[in-house]
Amino acid sequence: LWFDMITDQTHSQLISNNMDLMGLNKFLHTHYDSNMFDRFKFKFDGLETIEKNYSQAYQDMFTLSVLQGKRNGTYLEIGSADPYYGSNTALLEEFEWNGVSVEIDKELVERFKNARSNEVICSDATTLDYNEILSRISDENNVVDYLQLDCDPPEITYQVTKMIPFDKYKFRVITFEHDRWYSGDHIYNESRKLFTDLGYVRLVPNIAPDNRQDYEDWYVHPELVYPEVIEKMKITQGKIHKSEDYMIETKNKKGYGDFS
């Protein structure tokens, strides 16, 4: 199993047991390793230093690609879950990013505190003062590099999204989990309208770790990301997009771009 590579044996077994209890597919995560370097479509500064990533569907690699390997970035991660397995920010922390993670599960929060350097808040995400949190991590222009929105169920994710002061703060990259594959079109459609109205560009729609279970949209702010990056990385088709096919070159296919 992939998570055997990123954690100790005891923690790995605990993850495996919990996933069995929840009926989850332990092989559904797609990941990058250094053997894929030559086939990685959107190369960025520092890619050569990465042995492996952690996200379920390349969200960490996508963020670094959009921001061209940025060091010392910032993030707000709402719904952090495990500190490494499936984490969208563990790799960013290795790139010296600073951020705040929010997680309601006390056991996961304790694991996070023991394993990671950045701040984690144990709380119901619908009860927090996001203006206060963002004031601590945003730059002088009230910009944060990455926002992850991933609560369960997606109705909670959307509720939290409405609590974030987008009128004051902007984000270079946003990943929003709508879980359309099992929750239907309501949150899927409402979230798309919200982010479009806020001026964000949906760079990659209907992302999935496989070819069936579309569960996320990926956005960027056009004022905060280079236009040539948007042009090279944007997908306009509405079908489901397998994350590995989007990020990794396969034989006889031409890549979307190279930012090295």
Task: Give short role names for the model-derived ranges.
Residues W2-N72, Y84:
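Class I SAM-dependent methyltransferase Rossmann-like catalytic core
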Residues F42-K52, E119, V143-D152:
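Acidic/glycine-enriched edge-of-secondary-structure segments
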Residues T49-I50, S80, H178-S183:
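Short histidine/acidic/glycine/proline-rich micro-motifs that form metal-
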Residues I50-N131:
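SAM cofactor-binding core of SAM-dependent methyltransferases
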Residues L64, N131, S135, Y158-K162:
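Amphipathic, non-transmembrane alpha-helical secondary structure
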Residues T74, T89-N98, R111, D139-L149, ...:
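Conserved acidic-Pro-Pro-aromatic motif
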